[in-house]
C-alpha cells in the first residue's frame, strides 16, 4: 500500500528465459520504465516504490518481474483461479518473447486471446523479439487481433516489435512503435490502484487536450475504418474523423 493507505498500482512484465534475457531486461526496463542498471542487473522479482510520470499525472507503482521457460504453461498458470488475486491488482501485463508464424508451433494467438479474456480493463502488450517479423506484419497482426481476439471485456493484446530493424519512428498508420508505443499505452492505461496525482504542469494549463480521450477515439476510428470495404465510404469516413479532431483540438 501507499503511505496514505491506498492500493499501490502494479505492472507484471515477463521475459522468456534464454541466453539473451540479461540484455532484454536491461533494455526493456531501461527504455520503458527508465530504470538504471542498478535496478535491471539483479534478480529481484519485485521492484517497489517506482513513479510513473506524465505531463498530466503521476502514480506510484510496483513492477513485478517474472521469467518463463514455456509460454503456454505460464499462460495457463496466470489464467487459473489460483492467480485471481494477482490479476485483480494488476494494471497491465507485458510479455517479452518471440512471436512465431509457424503453423506447427503452439497457437500463440489462442493463448493471447485466453489471457486477454481474463484481463478486464488491463493493458496487455506482447513484445516480439523475432527480427524476421516486419512492422507491416505486426500492423496486420494487430488489426486481426483487434477484431478476432477482443474478449467480452473489450480487451485485446497489442503486439509490438522489440527490434526496430528499419529505424522507423511511426508505422503505416502514423502511430508510435517500439518502446515509445509501450510507454504511450501505459500513459493512458487504467491504473488498478487509482491514486493519480495531477502534476503541477497539468494544473497550470487546464486547457490542454485530454490525451486519453484522443487515443481512445483514434483507436475506435481506426477499427471502424478497417471494417469499411467501399473506397468512397472510407474516404468519407476519414474526412469526417479529420474534421472531428480538428474541432476537438481547437
Curated annotation (Swiss-Prot):
Transmembrane segments: none
Keywords: Chromosomal rearrangement
UniProt key word Kinase: no
The protein's role, per its UniProt record: Involved in gross chromosomal rearrangements (GCRs) and telomere healing.
Protein name: Increased recombination centers protein 6
Pfam families in UniProt: Adaptin_binding
Family: Belongs to the IRC6 family.
An example molecular function term from Gene Ontology annotations: protein-macromolecule adaptor activity
Gene Ontology biological-process annotations: vesicle-mediated transport
Domain of life: Eukaryota
Gene name, Swiss-Prot/TrEMBL: IRC6
Organism field: Vanderwaltozyma polyspora (strain ATCC 22028 / DSM 70294 / BCRC 21397 / CBS 2163 / NBRC 10782 / NRRL Y-8283 / UCD 57-17) (Kluyveromyces polysporus)
Entries under InterPro entries matching the protein: Irc6
Amino acid at each position: 500500500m501507499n503511505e496514505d493507505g491506498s492500493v499501490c498500482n502494479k505492472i507484471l512484465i515477463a521475459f522468456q528465459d534464454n541466453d539473451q534475457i540479461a540484455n532484454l531486461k536491461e533494455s526493456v526496463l531501461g527504455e520503458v520504465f527508465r530504470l538504471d542498471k542498478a535496478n535491471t542487473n539483479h534478480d529481484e522479482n519485485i521492484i517497489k516504490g517506482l513513479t510513473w510520470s506524465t505531463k498530466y499525472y503521476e502514480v506510484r507503482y510496483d513492477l513485478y518481474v517474472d521469467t518463463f521457460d514455456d509460454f503456454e504453461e505460464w499462460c495457463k498458470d496466470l489464467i487459473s483461479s489460483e492467480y485471481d488475486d494477482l490479476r485483480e491488482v494488476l494494471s497491465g501485463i507485458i510479455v517479452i518473447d518471440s512471436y512465431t508464424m509457424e503453423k506447427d508451433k503452439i497457437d500463440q494467438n489462442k493463448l493471447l486471446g485466453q489471457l486477454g479474456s481474463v484481463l478486464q480493463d488491463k493493458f496487455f502488450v506482447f513484445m516480439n523479439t523475432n527480427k524476421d517479423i516486419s512492422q507491416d506484419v505486426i500492423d496486420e497482426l494487430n488489426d486481426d487481433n483487434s477484431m478476432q481476439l477482443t474478449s467480452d471485456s473489450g480487451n485485446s493484446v497489442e503486439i509490438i516489435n522489440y527490434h526496430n530493424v528499419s529505424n522507423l519512428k511511426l508505422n503505416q498508420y502514423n502511430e508510435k512503435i517500439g518502446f515509445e508505443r509501450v510507454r504511450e499505452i501505459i500513459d493512458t492505461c487504467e491504473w488498478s490502484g487509482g491514486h493519480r496525482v495531477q502534476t503541477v504542469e497539468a494544473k497550470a494549463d487546464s486547457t490542454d487536450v485530454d490525451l486519453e480521450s484522443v487515443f481512445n477515439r483514434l483507436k475506435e476510428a481506426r477499427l471502424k475504418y478497417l471494417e469499411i470495404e467501399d473506397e468512397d465510404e472510407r474516404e468519407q469516413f476519414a474526412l469526417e474523423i479529420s474534421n472531428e479532431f480538428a474541432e476537438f483540438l481547437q
